[in-house]
Amino acid sequence: MTKWSPNSWRAKPIQQVPAYPDQAALAETEARLATFPPLVFAGEARKLKKQLASVAAGDAFLLQGGDCAESFAEHGADNIRDFFRVFLQMSVVLTFAGSQPVVKIGRIAGQFAKPRSSDNEVKDGVTLPSYRGDIINGTAFDTASRTPDPARQEMAYRQSAATLNLLRAFAQGGYANLENVHQWMLGFVADSPQGERYEALANRITETMDFMSAVGITSETNYALRETDFYTSHEALLLGYEEALTRVDSTSGDWYATSGHMIWIGDRTRQPDHAHIEYCRGIKNPLGLKCGPSLTADGLLELIDLLNPENEPGRLTLIARFGADKVGEHLPRLIRAVKKEGRNVVWSCDPMHGNTITAAGYKTRPFDRILREVQSFFEVHRAEGTHPGGIHIEMTGNNVTECTGGARAITAEELQDRYHTHCDPRLNADQAIELAFLVSELLKKNSGASEKKVVNG
């Protein structure tokens, strides 16, 4: 295999690359980015890899979620806070039900670029480049907005830095206090039309919290109850940006992507001899690989060999995204191939991307299909004797109407009320927490540990 360097991907074929008209400006932007401070640090990525190794071993569960694509317009403290608040509630529910730690990774502070099925979009006879995310171009359908602009990469970097700064403060500064999260969760249960279904679990958490307080285990006496580990992730799509933020770790001499703790490769860019695999194989961060219906068992093993040749636990997360009706057809063959070859991986379920439909003129995802894909994921793993390691969802902390269904039974006609996404439909705050409660039932059934309680929000 050829020697790897941060720019060796440039000699490979590449998919999903924007056509920048001003290549000199692009090179200047990338050169400036290469002088900027790293957004994350190698030690943090190593810590995440160690926690993901616990997931691979069946001793923890992965919760990964966030925006389909972050936007410059919606960047604000309230949006970040609301997302983090919902994410923490989901984590506590999953932790308690599964009697396992939950590894928390956001699709945030870098999730700006999106792959598209077509390079161009046509409206009223006018053809313009497709919107590829705010890091590349704008949503407005005019030439100026849709022309890829390198300056947007620096805007994305600065927004990521500001977002990370706030997330670190939330995670370590007391906002993640388990007592706070517990009270938020009780509010959700009280307000939910399905609250009675979730009340038993909520009451058990309350009893456990009361017991811990009675014996002196509180957020004041135990830092683990007021702080939490939270990591960032995004799809590594815009490789010039990723290369500029690829740095050598001074303690190990290894290369790390410092744009996020974990990065993943999309279903459209996983060709083994192409640029995205080439870039990702050389960095030491934890990696994700989206696995869709077209991926063969042999193709998956080839990619695992390229991305995790040392079979390192926690290095590679396989993110299955088939669609609710196709899990039983595709997932077992991949699990069997990986299991037969003894490969160490985390199996995660993306129940979003295979379940997109159009209703009332809007792209949407029915909640029942999302849940059904997760249920099928758990059923297949139970049958194969493997660990259903996590879920990977697109969500927001806001009260949007983008996915139909859920406890509040959002209809296709109601999608227009608060349809705010810049890209694909997201679960709203209530739907995301509801999904966590429903997944918690699957975890409890999977673990069989009804009495053992672990609280590690």
Language model feature labels by segment:
Residues 1-61:
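N-terminal basic/disordered segments at the start of proteins
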Residues 1-3, 449-457:
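Basic/polar N-terminal segments that are highly enriched at the extreme N-terminus
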Residues 19-22, 73, 428:
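Intrinsic-disorder/low-complexity, polar/charged segments
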Residues 47-49, 273-276, 303, 332-334:
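Glycine-rich, charged/polar anion/phosphate-binding loops
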Residues 52-55, 93-95, 279-280, 380-384:
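A general structural signal for short secondary-structure junctions and capping/turn motifs
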Residues 63-68, 105-108, 349-352, 394-396:
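Short loop/turn segments at strand-loop or loop-helix junctions that form parts
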Residues 70, 77-323, 365, 373-374, ...:
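Active-site-facing alpha/beta catalytic cores
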Residues 297-309, 315-347, 353-402, 454-456:
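Non-transmembrane, aqueous-exposed alpha-helical and coiled segments at domain scale
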